Amino acid sequence: MLMGSIARRYARALFSLAVEQGRVEPWNDALQVLKNAVEGSPDLRDVLSNPVYSKEQRRAIVEKLASALKLEREPANLLFLLGDRNRLAYLAAVVDTFRSLADQHLGRLRARVTSAVPLDASAAQAIADRLSKATNAKVLLDRAVDPSLLGGVIAQVGSLVYDGSVRTQLEDLRKTLKQ
């Protein structure tokens, strides 16, 4: 609970600045890149959260990372700030909260679409279009693969779940036959 409220505070502050500067979408993208870089590098996490390294050393590393990833100053400063305050563990929650705020601000929804096999671009676009019609909003897909579905897809938009998986259809058929 505490982690969520602290992450929201950081995300809202950065989001307010992004709105003020008209940089919501670029910063959202930059934060996703930053999150992936930190999650993908245990060494980087260690350097940023280890008090053995001085603030200057950590700042230099963040600046090199920002330069390598071509990040703007503000998203990069978030990483330094969290590391400096021993709150690097909050990075994913801050980025996810910022993403939610950005989606809301830009009038779009995220849908988690799970399929038995990876979706090609045209199938993903067709699903996004159908979900957009159903929700009257622009829908962005977060795709996942679950071979246990056997076929079809499950789409979750907020609290709504559209289950068109073969697994569910077979389970429903089994229940009907048992009756």
From Swiss-Prot:
Signal peptide: none
SUPFAM superfamilies, per the entry: N-terminal domain of the delta subunit of the F1F0-ATP synthase
A Gene Ontology cellular-component term: plasma membrane
GO molecular function list: proton-transporting ATP synthase activity, rotational mechanism
Keywords linked to the UniProt accession: ATP synthesis, Cell inner membrane, Cell membrane, CF(1), Hydrogen ion transport, Ion transport, Membrane, Transport
Entry's localization field: Cell inner membrane
Bilayer topology annotation: Peripheral membrane protein
Quaternary structure and interacting proteins, as annotated: F-type ATPases have 2 components, F(1) - the catalytic core - and F(0) - the membrane proton channel. F(1) has five subunits: alpha(3), beta(3), gamma(1), delta(1), epsilon(1). F(0) has three main subunits: a(1), b(2) and c(10-14). The alpha and beta chains form an alternating ring which encloses part of the gamma chain. F(1) is attached to F(0) by a central stalk formed by the gamma and epsilon chains, while a peripheral stalk is formed by the delta and b chains.
Function: F(1)F(0) ATP synthase produces ATP from ADP in the presence of a proton or sodium gradient. F-type ATPases consist of two structural domains, F(1) containing the extramembraneous catalytic core and F(0) containing the membrane proton channel, linked together by a central stalk and a peripheral stalk. During catalysis, ATP synthesis in the catalytic domain of F(1) is coupled via a rotary mechanism of the central stalk subunits to proton translocation.
Family indicated by similarity: Belongs to the ATPase delta chain family.
Protein name as annotated: ATP synthase subunit delta
